[in-house]
Amino acid sequence: MKKTLAALTVVATSFVITTPAAQAHIATPTWSAANSVSTGDQDAPAIATNRNGYVAVVWEDDRDTDNATDNVHSEIYLRTFRNGTALYEVKLSAGGSSGVTNWRHLHPDVGLDDKGNAVVVWQDDPDGNGYYNIPYRVVNTAGTVTASGSANTSSDGQQINPRVAVDPDGAPAGGAVAFSVVWEDIQTGTPATVKAAGYTGPTTRAWEVTASTTTGQHHNPDVAVSASGDAVVVWDDDGDANASYEIGLIRLGRTNGAATLSRRVANSNTGGQQTRPSVAANFNGDFAVAWESDHTGTAGSWTRSFTSTGVARFADVQVAAGGKAPSIGIDDESQTVVGWTVQATDLDVWVRGFGTDGTDAGRLSSQQLNSVPGGRQEQMTVAVSPYAQVAVAYTDDNDGNTYDQIYLGQDFSNNSW
């Protein structure tokens, strides 16, 4: 959009919801723009939060104004808040190599530890050759980059779609920033696989492994890390190469990347296509997954929750018919919130909360959650603190000029009390 909200601060009463049922739990967020500069096009937000009031948002920022659909010259920006107040905003990417005019930095993700340190990953092509690698940056609470590197050890082929998750209490507990990164690895003549790397310190890569099988196609990974440092990885899995995808799942150990939960399927309904998973884990290692599925004949978003030992609490639960690109967060009581995008007159963004029984009783009711009702809103992403505080971010084009910016909603709870 051509940013009418360059200095946006919207009161909670401006949000949009569907008509609630009796006793519904309706969110009342505090809204703001995550990006401080509204020139050009901001897309692909990701969000993280922690137990101490920090919220971090990253996005692609293309300040060209010639074509909103062209992501050439996109940079990666990070902005961090604490208790609703912005602490800093910083550009983490560095444009292109000398003489290169078609560079790109895309698909960012962010994680936070409990001290407020952020880890950001993205796919970068600074030399404009169409091949990507996965850089990372560690950023402290003052917005200073304290460590950097490349998550992938080999630059051969194509590395895309990275995600990151941060050990909440460091390694060892109370120690250095520790994190895990996953990405999709595509090598010439071989099927796409999912790679994972674990860091026990800001620059200490402890391991790199192939999380998926090496047969069939594997895409769109996500990762979540508990206080143990173990990483739960999910992805689109077609290990038997029959062109039907399920949600692959494995947990990898902090010290060496060995499986601490064997490779398996997260979804219980196996018909149709199961794709685009999102995963979240809490301090104790319980985790939950959301994904797209069309096994009923109609596409929608679904979810399932697991104990730290990998035992499912319930079979697949439908979040929303027609829901696309779900994002999930979890608190320390293993209650979850799922956000998604749905086709309406344009596109709208929604959220819904769940308890450990797979219902939304006492949790956020299914509701449209937009700051401004008009135009197109999409790419909803959700983060939940250990105390059930929720933060969301999404892209907004309420004036319909095709240029987006990033809206941030904070200060609401998944609990109804």
Segments the model singles out, each with a brief description of its role:
Residues 1-24:
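Secretory targeting and sorting signals
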Residues 24-417:
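Extracellular, repeat-based ectodomains that mediate carbohydrate processing or recognition
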